[in-house]
């Protein structure tokens, strides 16, 4: 038998919103009342007194009083319904809808000592064992302990549905017990079971049995509670009852928790902070914090189950996207006429669309920087150039790096370790409020190499990999003071890929006709198409590998000469690809190689990535 009761005790409380009033703390839990063999005497349980209530069947229930402040416990009194409707009406006039599993015929009136009537629900039978259930604000069971017998799943379901009802009512300023949360003291709600006198802690294991199946065709997913099933069904129905009230937003969510997390994108609140030494990151949700902590611990609990793969991931969403590399599924299609590309993840799709729109909405807020990015993840990773932090460690030799991709390159070259490193966690890269509204078109991609140890390069080569996306190709010094431009018309003769040059100027992936390579102290590289057709020759002169002296470009049918002279000492490093070798590709910023490896890998697979794709 279940008895809902309020106890004015401030311990163990869970916060519920109060609809404009002060937040009210309500905790739902399941505890043990004390029974005595003769039924006449009552024992005290840790200073808590119990009032006997005789039920209709002759058995005895107990109403708990809080002896700390001398106030009696409050039990919501409701009138006995005269009809067979599907709701009960509280004393304040509020109608409470009963869940499907609540049968009014199982509701029993209890006459209290003051002559009023309380309601007790007998819909579920609870085993007579040592049992405690702690029901959280989101309606889930946090802890479960049983003696020799297991808790009936119907019991868990009924309690969770009751908790969900309390949560909904509480959001309107009324708790599930019908008590208005104005300036009253913080309250504690309990569900009291008549059972054994032994008390146990609530820090226990949940059974985890999934007894609630989705009935929609082709789904059949199982859930541990009716409440979770109901939330899941909203993914089929599209029901989003929780709407953001921020001016101009209007987004809606399937759960109250989803709305609460979203509101923080407007307020900028990030209450969940990483406790790791030297880490100052904070997050909007505890789930995002948990995912972030795995970057410190190395935990990857989500494994790919495809035979022969064996990769594991920090989040289930990343695993889901990864599995599509096995299945070939690409559910997100670009609707731009003539494009026809498809993507495995929604994030990559949205980033791709910005290639067509030219949008670069994410701007670096560091004074004097003002760099812009198509992807928030690029901005997120760009921030590392403004810090001295090197958070990524090599597990072989202990070297530290600013970027995951630089670490990956080091492990491949120094330790022959080709194990993939997870480079992006989409859940971390959500734009903060106020970003994403500006547009900057006609940007460029910069191809660079990484110089191991310093994460710095001295020369950048800017180009594009898709015609019509930029007005020029630029060979530019790192400080931006000197450059050589190649026009858009000349660009079309280059093709979509160029060859690679090592740091000492030696070409790696040049065409078979080595005549394009000049000698006599000068090094050159032919910019070729994917088929190996020569489109343009760019001559690079590196004298004693110390000074970068001259760069010239020779175009197909027209000859253009440009000269770049500097006395600064800067090693020569240029990169590109035509044979599928993974390279570093920099998105118009200081050396950050995250996007580089990703884009190079896609080039290797025969794709033609766009600006920031």
Swiss-Prot record:
One of its GO terms (cellular component) is nucleus. It holds the Pfam family zf-C2H2. One of its GO terms (molecular function) is zinc ion binding. Its main location: nucleus. The modification N-acetylmethionine is found at residue 1. InterPro entries: Znf_C2H2_sf, Znf_C2H2_type. It is found in: Nucleus. Transcriptional activator. Activates the gene for selenocysteine tRNA (tRNAsec). In complex with HCFC1 and ZNF143, regulates the expression of several genes, including AP2S1, ESCO2, OPHN1, RBL1, UBXN8 and ZNF32. Binds to the SPH motif of small nuclear RNA (snRNA) gene promoters. Participates in efficient U6 RNA polymerase III transcription via its interaction with CHD8. In complex with HCFC1 and ZNF143, regulates the expression of several genes, including AP2S1, ESCO2, OPHN1, RBL1, UBXN8 and ZNF32. This is Zinc finger protein 143. It comes from Bos taurus. The lineage of its organism: Eukaryota, Metazoa, Chordata, Craniata, Vertebrata. The gene is ZNF143.
